């Protein structure tokens, strides 16, 4: 779910266009258009909503509900809560029994507590004293290492357990904050295959034939470099400079390495694809990918291996 925010007194901006491109690249179809600071320009709320709808017409938010709100007066907040309740009711809830994969967006030290990391828990549960695996997404970093959870906080309060979907702050034992960086990821030990090569399908309608041969890939809070080998207009093979804990169905955003423009979005089809060595192997693989499910096919994978 995304809240697409545009300020009433500023209107659509270059940053709004970047957000629109990311929404399209990720294939997001659940969201609300929120025009903030309505108290500063109440006469512009309707105009800005109409402008946002025009800009989002080619995305999954074309028919999203919209409302104007003010954090100063409280106007529109109740309507926004209602729209959020309605929207959340239509979206499935991740299982607290799934494997944990928490992409880290911050790490810091608190006196008397030690290292703390924050991120969004999208699936699984984290409890005090859990053992997790820390994987770095920085080039040249060491192998995955085990860490222990000393404490858990969510929404500003200490908890024994945090379940999805939640913002979480985890106090970790025996590791300095300086050795953890944005984009690193905490995992259920042994639950994820770390891969450098994946096959993907375009989900944004952009041709992968036109993508530069080297791009920046965004997944979770990580940004890594990848080499791109197109396999037709809709499919490609990505080779990362570091191993990543990806699964079939993951959505990735592709951006230019220089101008940083959003190039498109892709969904992972295979996290352990076959090598393409023989003449014509690329064309044959393109044909295979056209028939592959974005949710995985266990029987097909067993037969292939």
Question: Which functions belong to the PLM regions below?
Answer:
Residues 17, 42-47, 78-81, 116, ...:
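Short acidic, glycine/serine/threonine-rich loops at helix termini
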Residues 38, 54-206:
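Conserved catalytic-core segments of large NTP-driven translation/proteostasis enzymes
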């Amino acid at each position: 779910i995304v809240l697409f925010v545009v300020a009433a007194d500023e209107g659509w901006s270059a940053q709004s266009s970047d957000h629109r491109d990311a929404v399209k690249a990720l294939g997001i179809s659940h969201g609300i258009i929120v025009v903030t600071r309505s108290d500063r320009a109440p006469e512009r709320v309707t105009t800005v909503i109409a402008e946002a709808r025009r800009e989002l017409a080619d995305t999954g938010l074309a028919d999203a509900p919209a409302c104007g709100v003010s954090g100063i007066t409280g106007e529109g907040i109740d309507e926004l809560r209602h729209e959020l309740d309605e929207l959340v009711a239509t979206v499935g809830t991740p299982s607290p029994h799934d494997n944990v994969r928490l992409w880290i967006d911050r790490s810091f030290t608190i006196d008397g507590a030690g290292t703390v990391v924050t991120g969004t828990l999208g699936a699984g549960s984290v409890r005090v004293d859990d053992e997790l695996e820390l994987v770095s997404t920085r080039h040249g970093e060491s192998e995955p290492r085990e860490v222990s959870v000393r404490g858990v906080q969510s929404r500003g309060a200490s908890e024994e357990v945090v379940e999805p979907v939640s913002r979480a702050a985890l106090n970790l034992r025996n590791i300095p904050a300086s050795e953890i960086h944005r984009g690193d990821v905490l995992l259920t030990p042994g639950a994820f295959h770390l891969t450098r090569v994946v096959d993907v399908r375009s989900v944004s309608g952009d041709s992968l034939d036109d993508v530069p041969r080297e791009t920046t890939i965004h997944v979770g809070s990580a940004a890594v470099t990848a080499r791109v080998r197109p396999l037709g207009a809709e499919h490609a093979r990505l080779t990362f400079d570091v191993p990543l804990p990806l699964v079939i169905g993951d959505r990735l955003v592709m951006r230019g390495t220089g101008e940083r423009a959003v190039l498109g979005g892709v969904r992972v089809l295979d996290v352990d694809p076959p090598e393409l060595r023989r003449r014509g192997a690329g064309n044959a693989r393109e044909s295979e990918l056209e028939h592959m499910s974005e949710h995985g096919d266990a029987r097909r994978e067993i037969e292939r291996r």
